[in-house]
């Protein structure tokens, strides 16, 4: 009887430790507020980071943020400063308009599309060339 109680208690402890958001994440992934994160200290272009994240998990993409608390959580597990965010082509041509309100239909950009990188130490976001290489955090 005592052994049954001990085993039952052990199973209860295991169940309670797995219940919650952590149980939904694959091993090697961290959980926060119902999302799963995996930090990769591996520099790559933004396009490669997007592809890499979807290879790690079908629903995964470079990280995006919903709150400053989410950023604080990620900073606590990071070992590097700069990483790609899941934001690309911030000067989205479909939304551009001239100051008089007319649509931009002629373009002569001198650079390629821009992507966004985050500096973890102070949560500052910067636009940069998508062809540069930075680390990536995948999220789903």
Swiss-Prot record:
One of its GO terms (cellular component) is extracellular region. PROSITE patterns: C_TYPE_LECTIN_1 (PS00615), C_TYPE_LECTIN_2 (PS50041). SUPFAM superfamilies: C-type lectin-like. It is found in: Secreted. Pfam families: Lectin_C. It comes from the Eukaryota. InterPro entries: C-type_lectin-like (IPR001304), C-type_lectin-like/link_sf (IPR016186), C-type_lectin/snaclec_domain (IPR050111), C-type_lectin_CS (IPR018378), CTDL_fold (IPR016187). PANTHER family: MANNOSE, PHOSPHOLIPASE, LECTIN RECEPTOR RELATED (PTHR22803). Keywords: Disulfide bond, Hemostasis impairing toxin, Secreted, Signal, Toxin. Its main location: secreted. Belongs to the snaclec family. Residues 1-23 form the signal peptide. Residues 32-139 form the C-type lectin domain. GO terms for molecular function: toxin activity. It comes from Crotalus adamanteus (Eastern diamondback rattlesnake). This is C-type lectin 6. Disulfide bonds join 25-36, 53-138, 115-130. Expressed by the venom gland. Interferes with one step of hemostasis (modulation of platelet aggregation, or coagulation cascade, for example). Gene3D superfamilies: Mannose-Binding Protein A, subunit A (3.10.100.10). The lineage of its organism: Eukaryota, Metazoa, Chordata, Craniata, Vertebrata. Heteromultimer; disulfide-linked.
